[in-house]
């Protein structure tokens, strides 16, 4: 019985950082979406948007998938070597804060220019996280590739709104 209990505890110890981070990321995304709600209904429709802007339904679906990947990247970073873990988790936290601040600055504050500054900083933080992960945590890099591509596209959409409004 003790051996089975030990295996369960060990398995939970491996899985818990992934699960908790995914839940945290999805919760932060939900809070951000609540802050965006009014601007999405009243302000955003009046903006000139890029012809490449996807239909509205794409955004919550894409972000939900990305938040799961971001959470998995946290779990992978959590299990990285002790000498790498601190920097990886630090940069993961920085990108998380910037990700949330983009929604606040672009939608809640209704400031595309502030959003542009934040998304550029977010892109830098994601690239730094990926570079620091290259030896210690390849799973995190794999999780962040689609995130980086989506952020680059979002930066283009943000820049378009800045330039044409």
Residue ranges and their predicted role:
Residues 48-61:
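Short aromatic-rich membrane-water interface segments that cap or initiate transmembrane helices
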Residues 63-74, 95-98, 122:
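Core segments of transmembrane alpha-helices
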Residues 83-92:
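Membrane-interfacial loop-to-transmembrane alpha-helix junctions, especially the N-terminal start
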Residues 104-113, 160-165:
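Membrane-interface helix caps and helix-loop-helix hairpins in membrane proteins
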Residues 106-112, 127-141:
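Membrane-helix boundary connector in multi-pass membrane proteins
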């Amino acid at each position: 019985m003790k051996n089975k209990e030990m295996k369960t505890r060990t398995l939970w110890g491996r899985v818990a950082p992934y699960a908790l981070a995914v839940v945290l990321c999805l919760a932060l995304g939900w809070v951000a979406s609540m802050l965006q709600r009014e601007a999405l209904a009243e302000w955003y429709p009046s903006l000139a948007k890029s012809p490449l802007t996807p239909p509205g339904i794409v955004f919550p679906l894409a972000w939900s998938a990305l938040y799961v990947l971001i959470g998995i990247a946290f779990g992978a970073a959590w299990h990285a070597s002790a000498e790498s873990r601190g920097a990886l988790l630090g940069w993961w936290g920085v990108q998380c804060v910037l990700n949330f601040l983009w929604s606040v600055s672009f939608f809640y504050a209704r400031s595309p220019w502030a959003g542009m500054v934040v998304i550029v900083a977010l892109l830098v933080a994601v690239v730094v996280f990926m570079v620091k992960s290259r030896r210690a945590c390849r799973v995190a890099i794999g999780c962040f590739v689609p995130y980086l591509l989506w952020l680059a596209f979002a930066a283009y959409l943000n820049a378009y709104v800045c330039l044409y409004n």
